[in-house]
């Protein structure tokens, strides 16, 4: 079998472009260089901030960031995304690398994400992209839709005593004696029940605008935190409408008062109780609100299908925040491509 040459690669890439490589649209629409200063301030050591071109240079930070975006877009592990970049010309091109260039390995990518996670930088990069969305004309419009979805992590097989110690914020003594076991235990994830099913992991609380279905703010907590507990952190004055849409989990007299005091208009579903069923007017109001509120479910559905699922395989809430934040960013990037395609039609 002959070796793939430069012109062979160029011909294959041209054929991919002719077929419609979706990564080319993403590459064109994302302002990659606008992220550089913040990323390099976190990931480069003083020795890597070189004043000359002598010696071996570190891997470009934007190449690694592009690789994280690829990973989130396709729900790949570190090892899988390394393999796919080596194997697929479209992935290599997305990184702006040639067939002769070295590809970051899985360990390098893991270390890069660790630095971003510990610095809390993913949230800032998400906000920077939101500024780019507004600059392109996609300001938050039509009201704020709030909701939360469970993000599972691999189940922990702990004894009852171990679970009680973790809930109390303690580390079981047996784990101290087995450092390898301790490293594999997620002490931040929690169990919760939804629709009669038990889940272990975290929650992705989001605020999406009703007009564009773009995520504008998000918060990551353990799965046991009630949806309504993060409402204050999610709401923003940046939407052109004062309407706030949410399911009945966000309904309480206290929340209604807070919304009014902050100048928001509650469009939160009214909940029926055992003693008080909904009036016809309340049921009609809920139906009308559902026509808009249901759009936030499209966000989670897209993350589940187009982005390959929501499960994360990290340990600890710091890493979970980074992975979930990257998933939210990847959703907004893909959504921008869709909005631009609709606008051009």
Model-flagged regions — what are they?
Residues 24-69, 73, 103:
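Basic, short loop/linker segments at the boundary and entry of helix-turn-helix/winged-helix-like folds
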Residues 229, 254, 275-282:
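Short, charged, surface-exposed secondary-structure boundary motifs
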Residues 262-270:
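Short hydrophobic/aromatic-enriched beta-strand-loop microsegments
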Residues 262, 284-345:
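Basic, amphipathic alpha-helical segments enriched in Lys/Arg and hydrophobic/aromatic residues
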Residues 49-56, 270-278:
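Arg/Lys-rich, glycine/proline-spaced intrinsically disordered segments
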Residues 31, 55-63, 101-105, 288-292, ...:
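Secondary-structure capping and boundary motifs in well-ordered enzyme cores
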Residues 56, 79, 83-86, 95-100, ...:
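Polybasic low-complexity intrinsically disordered regions
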Residues 1-44, 338-345:
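Charged, often Cys/His-bearing segments associated with DNA-binding zinc-finger transcription factors
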């Amino acid at each position: 079998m002959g070796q793939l040459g430069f012109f062979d690669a160029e011909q294959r890439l041209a054929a991919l472009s002719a077929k419609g490589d979706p990564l080319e649209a993403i590459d064109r629409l994302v302002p990659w260089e606008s992220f550089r200063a913040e990323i390099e301030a976190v990931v480069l050591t003083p020795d890597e901030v070189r004043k000359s071109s002598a010696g071996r240079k570190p891997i470009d930070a934007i190449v690694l960031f592009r690789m994280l975006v690829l990973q989130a877009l396709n729900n790949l592990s570190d090892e899988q995304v390394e393999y796919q970049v080596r194997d697929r010309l479209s992935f290599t091109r997305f990184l702006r690398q040639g067939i002769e260039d070295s590809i970051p390995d899985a360990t390098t990518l893991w270390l890069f994400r660790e630095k971003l996670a510990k610095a809390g930088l993913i949230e800032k990069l998400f906000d920077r992209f939101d500024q780019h969305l507004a600059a392109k004309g996609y300001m938050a419009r039509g009201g704020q839709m709030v909701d939360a979805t469970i993000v599972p992590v691999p189940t922990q097989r702990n004894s009852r005593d171990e679970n009680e110690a973790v809930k109390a914020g303690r580390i079981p003594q047996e784990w101290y004696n087995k450092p390898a076991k301790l490293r594999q235990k997620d002490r931040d994830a929690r169990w919760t029940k939804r629709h009669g099913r038990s889940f272990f992991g975290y929650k992705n609380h989001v605020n999406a605008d009703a007009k564009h279905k773009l995520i504008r703010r998000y918060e990551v907590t353990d799965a046991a935190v009630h949806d309504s507990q993060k409402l204050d952190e999610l709401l923003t004055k940046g939407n052109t409408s004062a309407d706030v849409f949410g399911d009945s989990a966000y309904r309480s007299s206290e929340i209604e008062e807070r919304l009014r005091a902050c100048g928001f208009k509650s469009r939160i579903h009214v909940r029926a109780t055992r003693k008080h069923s909904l009036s016809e007017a309340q049921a009609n109001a809920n139906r009308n609100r559902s026509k808009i509120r249901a759009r936030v479910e499209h966000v989670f559905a897209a993350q589940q299908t187009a982005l390959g699922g929501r499960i994360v395989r990290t340990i600890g809430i710091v890493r979970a925040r980074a992975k979930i934040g990257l998933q939210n960013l990847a959703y907004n990037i893909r959504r921008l491509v869709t909005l631009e395609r609709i606008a051009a039609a």
